């Protein structure tokens, strides 16, 4: 019981909402934190290298010009149709721009937040990501097992499914054949590197 997030506990037990509603609100809360990182990336590129490092691994390197699309796409796939709500919350709790002391200052602050919301929303729609959660994987677990030439599933296949989503976000026009080719090449390259490291 101690593992249940406090927000979820309050919503489910105190407010007596359905478990699915509680989960949705917790997901919005989590996504709004991730949006804070995304806003920084979209507005200034300040954390580009940090985000890129999170997305990359030995099998997949995201091209620098596609980091924004992949990172935003992963957040939207988690939060789905509630992404605008999560973005709105993130903008509200975002560190304030300057210290507004008078009413005019507060109005300026609100205007800045409104502009920021519109700007980030436009960036996401320009990246063609609204509805990205409906994107079907080019390969299912069975097909991945075939490409990897393994007999059973497990964590390995799960990791490849996550990589596959990133690859598709980075290659929106990519075909199943191109995806399989990338997987084979990545696997071979990784094996070569491991052999070189051990010799």
Give the ranges of each region predicted by the language model.
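C-terminal subdomains that position terminal phosphate/3'-OH groups for nucleotidyl transfer/ligation
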Residues: 1-199
């Amino acid at each position: 019981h101690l593992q249940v997030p406090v927000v979820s506990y309050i919503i489910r037990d105190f407010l007596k909402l359905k478990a699915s509603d509680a989960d949705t609100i917790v997901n919005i809360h989590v996504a709004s934190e991730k949006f804070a990182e995304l806003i920084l990336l979209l507005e200034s590129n300040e954390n580009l290298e940090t985000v890129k490092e999170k997305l990359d691994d030995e099998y997949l390197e995201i091209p620098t010009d596609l980091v924004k699309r992949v990172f935003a796409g992963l957040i939207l796939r988690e939060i789905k149709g509630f992404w605008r709500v999560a973005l709105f919350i993130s903008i509200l709790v975002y560190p304030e721009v300057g210290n507004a002391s008078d009413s005019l200052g507060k109005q300026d602050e609100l205007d800045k937040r409104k502009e920021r919301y519109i700007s980030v929303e436009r960036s996401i729609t320009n990246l063609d990501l609204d509805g990205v959660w409906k994107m079907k994987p080019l390969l299912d677990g069975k097909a991945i097992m075939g490409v990897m030439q393994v007999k059973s599933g497990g964590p390995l296949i799960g990791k490849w499914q996550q990589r596959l989503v990133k690859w598709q976000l980075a290659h929106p026009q990519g075909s199943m054949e191109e995806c399989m080719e990338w997987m084979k090449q990545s696997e071979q390259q990784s094996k070569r590197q491991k052999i070189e490291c051990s010799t």
